Design a protein with these regions (language model features):
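Catalytic Tyr-X3-Lys loop
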Residues: 1-2, 8, 15-34, 49, ...
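Active-site loop-to-helix junction immediately N-terminal to the catalytic Tyr of the SDR YXXXK motif
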Residues: 12, 63-71, 83, 111
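Active-site loop immediately N-terminal to the catalytic Tyr-X3-Lys motif
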Residues: 15, 62-68, 90-91, 133, ...
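Active-site helix of classical SDR
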Residues: 37, 73
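Alpha-helical segment proximal to the catalytic Tyr-Lys
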Residues: 42, 86-90
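Residue(s) in the substrate-gating loop at a strand-loop-helix junction
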Residues: 57
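Short, small/polar-rich loop/turn modules that mediate ligand/substrate recognition or access, typified
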Residues: 89, 94, 156-158
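C-terminal substrate-recognition "lid" of short-chain dehydrogenase/reductases
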Residues: 134-164, 169
Length: 174
């Protein structure tokens, strides 16, 4: 089972954040991970085996500007992944997460690129701090996903969050 929920809502400033909007983003992401886990883990537990892959975000490790509810929700998913791994391992279920960095998708394209395809200032800043020098593509997640679901390759891997960010988290700025 792979859980993936996401939606970015931007506020003007911290003081402009709408509690209902924050709740919506947090609930969509966190409850969108919790509820499917409850449903599908029940069947996996009855079979005595299974693998859960949650989708967190590099925002869980280092919150980024303009999206505090999203960052908080993804941090909750990372924490929940570790918690669930501890409890589900007793019934043969491994639980891990993947934390994508900056991926150029329809969801964030307008934040990272201009209509003509050039980079926005935010997009330029991100790429200047990404050693691989590009945004991720959904296909960049496949290898990590396949590794985590393969019991032979990762059968003793449980409760971790794997960064897939082109080196963004490793870059020190110098």
């Amino acid at each position: 089972m792979v859980t993936l929920t996401t939606l970015l809502k931007l506020g003007n400033t911290f003081f402009d954040l709408d509690p209902a909007g924050v709740g919506f983003v947090f609930n969509l992401n966190f409850l969108g991970t919790l509820l499917p886990s409850q449903v599908f883990c029940k069947g996996m537990a009855l079979r005595g085996q299974g693998t859960v892959i949650n989708i967190s975000s590099m925002n869980a490790f280092r919150p980024l500007t303009k999206i505090p509810a999203y960052s908080a929700a993804k941090a909750a998913i990372s924490n929940f992944t570790a918690w669930l791994a501890t409890h589900m391992s007793e019934v043969g279920i491994r639980v891990n997460a993947i934390a994508p960095g900056f991926f150029l998708t329809n969801q964030n394209r307008t934040l990272l690129t201009n209509p003509d395809g050039s980079l926005t200032p935010r997009g330029n800043t991100i790429l200047s701090h990404t050693p691989m020098g590009r945004f991720g593509t959904p296909e960049d997640l496949f290898g990590t996903l396949l590794w985590l679901v393969d019991d032979e390759a990762s059968g003793f891997v449980n409760g971790i969050v794997v960064p897939v960010d082109g080196g963004f988290a490793a870059f020190s700025g110098v």
